[in-house]
Each structure stands twice: as C-alpha cells, then as structure tokens.
C-alpha cells in the first residue's frame, strides 16, 4: 500500500519494489505468528513486517530489543467474524455464537481488544488508545483495491501479482 501510494499507483514500479522486498525474505512463514517466531525467537532476518499486535507483543515480551517503525501508510486489516449457521445449529450453540458476535463489538470487548494490542474498530474506543496506536496513519482499506473480489482477481489469481513476485 505504501509503495503504491508513494509511486502514484504506478503498477510497474510497485512490482519492482515488491520483488526487491521479497528477494530479501529469508523465511516466508505461512502466518503472522510463525513469522514473528522466526524473527524474534530464532533471530532470523533484519526486519519483521508484522501486524500491529504482533509488533506490540514482541516489544512486551522482549523489552528494549526491538524498535517499532510505523509507516505513514498501511492497510487496515479487518478479519471477518461470522456465525456458521449449520455448524452452530448442529452443536446447539447458535445463541451462544450470536451472543459472542454481538459482544465482540461492544465497548467492553473493544477495550479488551485495545488492551491486547488490537486496533479497536469503534472510533471512540480507539481514541482511548491514542498513546498506543498511531491515529494519524493513512489507513487504506480493501475498498481502495476495488473490494475483495477485485483485489483477489488482481493480486492472487493464478499468474497475477503475487505469483509474478513470488515465482520470479
């Protein structure tokens, strides 16, 4: 997101930058926790590109060993949460699952999220954590990439951007 914004959305320059970035990746773990473990616990690599919460947890677990460098532009990642109706019905947990989902967006749960280094989605609660989160960061969303369907088509379909970067 940063490089694309910096370079005026020039796709060729963005691809060059991303290829160069991936060329420097020692280990491409399958998930955020694995990448953090590889970097923090195994000492592999010079830089960890991570979720905010992973960076904050690393600082808490290993004080004075790392520095968080916050970009001016990043992606607001909003993982989906849903009740899987058929599964909940089969296990008799529909009301419990729905209650959890409703609670997840309550002020109390949003504060718990912030206390555990997750960026609250409610603006008023996020403001309470202004000392923790950079509130001036330009956060792009999936909509800036044309929505999920378009982003998947442009970046993750066979032969598209990710394949071009990763396989060359």
Q: Predicted segments — roles?
A:
Residues 77-81:
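Small-molecule pocket liners
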Residues 53-56, 73-76, 87-89, 118:
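Solvent-exposed loop/turn segments at secondary-structure junctions
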Residues 60-62, 73, 129-134:
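A generic structural signal for short, solvent-exposed coil/turn residues
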Residues 88-168:
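Extracellular/periplasmic juxtamembrane helices and adjacent flexible linkers that interface
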Residues 34-38, 83-85, 118-121:
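N-terminal low-complexity, Ser/Thr/acidic repeat segments characteristic of secreted
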Residues 2-71:
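Ligand-binding pocket segment of bilobal, Venus flytrap-like solute-binding proteins
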Residues 1-2, 98:
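Residues on a specific face of well-ordered alpha-helices
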């Amino acid at each position: 997101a940063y490089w694309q914004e910096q370079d005026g959305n020039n796709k060729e320059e963005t691809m060059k930058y991303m290829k160069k970035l991936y060329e420097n990746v020692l280990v491409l773990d399958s998930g955020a926790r694995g990448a953090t473990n590889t970097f923090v616990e195994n000492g592999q690599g010079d830089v960890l590109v991570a979720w905010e919460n992973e960076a904050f947890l690393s600082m808490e677990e290993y004080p004075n060993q790392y520095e968080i460098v916050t970009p001016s532009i990043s992606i607001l990642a909003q993982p989906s949460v849903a009740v899987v109706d058929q599964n909940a019905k089969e296990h008799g947990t529909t009301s419990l699952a729905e209650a959890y989902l409703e609670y997840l967006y309550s002020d109390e749960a949003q504060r718990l999220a912030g206390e555990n280094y997750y960026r609250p989605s409610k603006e008023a609660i996020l403001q309470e954590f202004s000392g923790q989160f950079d509130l001036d960061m330009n956060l792009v969303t999936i909509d800036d990439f044309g929505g999920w369907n378009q982003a998947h088509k442009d970046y993750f379909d066979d032969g598209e951007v990710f394949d071009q970067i990763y396989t060359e």
